[in-house]
């Protein structure tokens, strides 16, 4: 019978295996706080932990044994778990996972060797060192070096290991930010734009999401970078707005909370994500948001009832590489490849071309990504404006994280249709 801490380690192990085998998202697994800390920590440092293991064995063991070893080494060197406890619980974990006595002996030997040797020496070549030290694939580090230069690229790689700052967005239609902060025990926390409250690191998000205040629709989780993106739309009362790639619905909800007179269509191509957006709208009590399942690239878009007329404002937050939010979504860095970025570029451009056809003359379209990469941002915009002279850039692009490190790494550019 496993005790509670061992159950949490087993949870983390199983979720990590699913991530490795099926590409599942760790944050969607519903793990307990300690198990989530372990799983996300191992995911963030996966390449480094693999490098560590390779320095101690002649041949890598099976995926299952490697995951157990990564959990053990992570606890020994990156948490406050005492070394002896990390070794003992990791050996117990491999036995509980029925991976065999031979695997248990191997894990025990490797962890004791790690304890004696300490962390391995990193390679001298800078790109390789930055890649391993920060668990960012070498091709991506080299790409960042080429685009941003060595110092900024190294800083970007280091930032992927940091926990993203968490914020709540208060629904000002129901309550004020200071009142919600007091209800949640966040008195004294930083408040931005009168509606965003920074969540201290020691506060568990699970506790906030289980509160009556959340159930009543008094707040949502959202980074303030979203507000800076929405501001570019220059919203006015009674406008028709289309949030074309809206899931999970946070920006649509923000707009509705900002002005209840707006007529907002929030759409997504995924039926499952659309169902979740309905839940968001219902929880927040928003009456001016319609939620629809719409494929922006569909040839029948112009005949679709929901999109039968033009919109005064369009927000196009396109699918992207997530390079600006790797600290929040650590799995993203391992999903990327040079080919996947090229595919994303073509999808992003196609979405922009299709959505722009539904913008009225004099209207504003905001193109946004949670990636600062030029291939997904400025190159898309410049290509589009060149091909469509009826559109022009409306002001400079916005990179919220450049001004405040607490913000997600978004890019947004407003386009005006002449």
Q: What feature does the model see in each segment?
A:
Residues 1-418:
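S-adenosylmethionine
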């Amino acid at each position: 019978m496993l005790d509670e801490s061992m159950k949490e380690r087993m949870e983390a192990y199983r979720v990590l295996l699913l991530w490795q085998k099926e590409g599942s998202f760790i944050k969607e697994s519903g793990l307990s706080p300690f198990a989530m800390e372990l799983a996300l920590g191992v995911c963030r440092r996966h390449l480094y932990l693999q490098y560590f293991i390779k320095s101690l064995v002649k041949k890598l063991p099976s995926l299952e044994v490697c995951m157990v070893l990564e959990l053990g080494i992570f606890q020994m060197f990156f948490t406050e778990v005492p070394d002896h406890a990390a070794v003992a619980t990791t050996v117990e974990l491999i036995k509980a996972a029925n991976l065999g006595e031979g695997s248990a002996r191997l894990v025990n030997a490797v962890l004791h060797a790690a304890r004696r040797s300490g962390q391995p020496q990193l390679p001298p070549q800078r790109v390789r060192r930055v890649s391993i030290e920060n668990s960012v694939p070498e091709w991506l580090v080299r790409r960042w070096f080429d685009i941003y230069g060595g110092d900024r690229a190294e800083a970007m790689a280091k930032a992927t290991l940091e926990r993203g700052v968490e914020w709540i967005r208060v629904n000002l239609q129901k309550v004020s930010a200071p009142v919600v902060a007091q209800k949640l025990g966040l008195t004294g926390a930083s408040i931005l734009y009168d509606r965003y409250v920074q969540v201290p690191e020691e506060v568990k998000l699970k506790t906030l999401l289980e509160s009556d205040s959340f159930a009543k629709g008094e707040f949502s989780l959202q980074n303030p970078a979203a507000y800076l993106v929405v501001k570019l739309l220059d919203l006015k009362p009674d406008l028709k707005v289309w949030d074309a790639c809206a899931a999970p619905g946070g920006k649509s909800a923000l707009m509705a909370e900002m002005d209840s007179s707006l007529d907002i269509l929030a759409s997504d191509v995924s039926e499952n994500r659309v169902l979740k957006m309905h839940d968001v709208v219902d929880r927040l009590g928003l009456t001016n948001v319609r939620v629809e399942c719409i494929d922006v690239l569909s040839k029948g878009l112009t005949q679709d009832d929901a999109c039968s007329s033009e919109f005064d404002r369009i927000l196009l937050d396109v699918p992207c590489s997530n390079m600006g939010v790797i600290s929040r979504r650590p799995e993203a860095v391992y999903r990327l490849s040079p080919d996947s970025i090229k595919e994303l570029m073509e999808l992003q451009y196609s979405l922009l071309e299709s959505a722009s056809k539904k913008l009225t003359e004099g209207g504003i379209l905001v193109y946004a990504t949670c990636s600062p990469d030029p291939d997904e941002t400025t190159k898309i915009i410049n290509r589009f404006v060149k091909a469509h002279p009826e559109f022009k850039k409306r002001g400079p692009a916005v990179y919220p994280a450049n001004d405040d490190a607490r913000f997600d790494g978004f890019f947004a550019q407003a386009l005006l249709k002449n």
